[in-house]
Amino acid sequence: MAMNIRKTHPLIKIVNNSLIDLPTPSNISIWWNFGSLLGLCLIIQILTGLFLAMHYTADISSAFSSVAHICRDVNYGWLIRNTHANGASMFFICVYLHIARGLYYGSYLNKETWNIGVIILLLLMATAFVGYVLPWGQMSFWGATVITNLLSALPYIGDMLVQWIWGGFSVDSATLTRFFTFHFLLPFVIVALTMVHLLFLHEAGSNNPTGLISNMDKIPFHPYYSYKDLLGFFILLFFLTFLALFTPNLLTDAENFIPANPLVTPPHIKPEWYFLFAYAILRSIPNKLGGVLALAFSILILLLVPILHTSKQRSLTFRPISQLLFWLLVANTIILTWIGGQPVEQPFITIGQIASITYFSFFLILFPIAGWWENKMLNL
């Protein structure tokens, strides 16, 4: 009898082992859908980005006009632009839910997969930041100026590093050109790292809601989870289409409809909504270098989570104290996001400082203590 080609062909075999015959735990919930949704978001962003790049001009004299030209004169340019802009928001919603799932169910104990995931997150944030500069509106220009200028806080090399990134003594045409280059290049680096992420994941196998080893109860990925993922795709595409067609500017800043003007500073300089929690942490520290370090550490702290895991149980499913802390962390992050969008005045300054301290306390102090306490309670 002839062997099935999907199991013998060198290339198709890889796809088969990753998407068809992959042994998958039988009890993984909808929270495991976000990995595939992120893959869909990445494909949508790359495709819409390629079509936008065909019509975009990376020069300060014509960048703003070229975006207007895309929306007004290019066939379905408005749809491509709206899908790309709102696709970034959907991407970050899925990323944050994916990370939250990993924290809740202890997926971070698969260390290689988790660490690659954190690197992907950093690259994703870099891609989104440089992409936000490209329309060359007021918030694009001032956001680029403020955030890149933070690097000048680094001792010895700071000023040189900022001028090197700017390509001059201010954010100018050279800056825009290199930011466009990075925005074009980085998604493909993310694709490569996603492959590595999946490689490490399939090396160890997926986690499941109980956090227990599920080798004795696995089912093939197709048809069970492939159809489940398709349902997720339709739901995501519905929300993305709704955003792009009905409220395309819901999540954008009105300031960005004004062409960049170095002589006029916007009343409130703030990034897109998905960076506001980190921006709030940055602003809550009066010292410039301290703020930059806190900003970096707000993301890099995820690398410490596997090291600080003290519980005998992997998942939070049977750990009520840690569950409470987890949801308090979620609430705290939402508060930080709200504070990041508010002006720098009381009471927002104090709330931001308290929320920043508690954000780091959850990871460094409260979760390890809760894990240790729950271990003690198991022995009662």
Swiss-Prot record:
Spans through the membrane: 34-54, 78-99, 114-134, 179-199, 227-247, 289-309, 321-341, 348-368
Cofactors (names): heme b
CDD domains: cytochrome_b_C, Cytochrome_b_N
Membrane disposition: Multi-pass membrane protein
Keyword Nucleus: no
GO biological process: mitochondrial electron transport, ubiquinol to cytochrome c
GO cellular component entries: mitochondrial inner membrane; respiratory chain complex III
UniProt family annotation: Belongs to the cytochrome b family.
Source organism: Pastinachus sephen
Function: Component of the ubiquinol-cytochrome c reductase complex (complex III or cytochrome b-c1 complex) that is part of the mitochondrial respiratory chain. The b-c1 complex mediates electron transfer from ubiquinol to cytochrome c. Contributes to the generation of a proton gradient across the mitochondrial membrane that is then used for ATP synthesis.
GO molecular function terms listed in the Swiss-Prot or TrEMBL record: metal ion binding; ubiquinol-cytochrome-c reductase activity
One Pfam family hit: Cytochrome_B
Additional remarks: Heme 1 (or BL or b562) is low-potential and absorbs at about 562 nm, and heme 2 (or BH or b566) is high-potential and absorbs at about 566 nm.
Protein's UniProt name: Cytochrome b
PROSITE patterns: CYTB_CTER (PS51003), CYTB_NTER (PS51002)
Subcellular location(s) of the protein: Mitochondrion inner membrane
Highest taxon of source: Eukaryota
Gene3D superfamilies: Cytochrome Bc1 Complex, Chain C (1.20.810.10)
Keyword terms of this UniProt record: Electron transport, Heme, Iron, Membrane, Metal-binding, Mitochondrion, Mitochondrion inner membrane, Respiratory chain, Transmembrane, Transmembrane helix, Transport, Ubiquinone
UniProt-annotated binding residues for heme b b562: H84, H183
Assembly and oligomerization: The cytochrome bc1 complex contains 3 respiratory subunits (MT-CYB, CYC1 and UQCRFS1), 2 core proteins (UQCRC1 and UQCRC2) and probably 6 low-molecular weight proteins.
Residues that coordinate or bind heme b b566: H98, H197
Cofactor note: Binds 2 heme b groups non-covalently.
Residues bound to a ubiquinone: H202
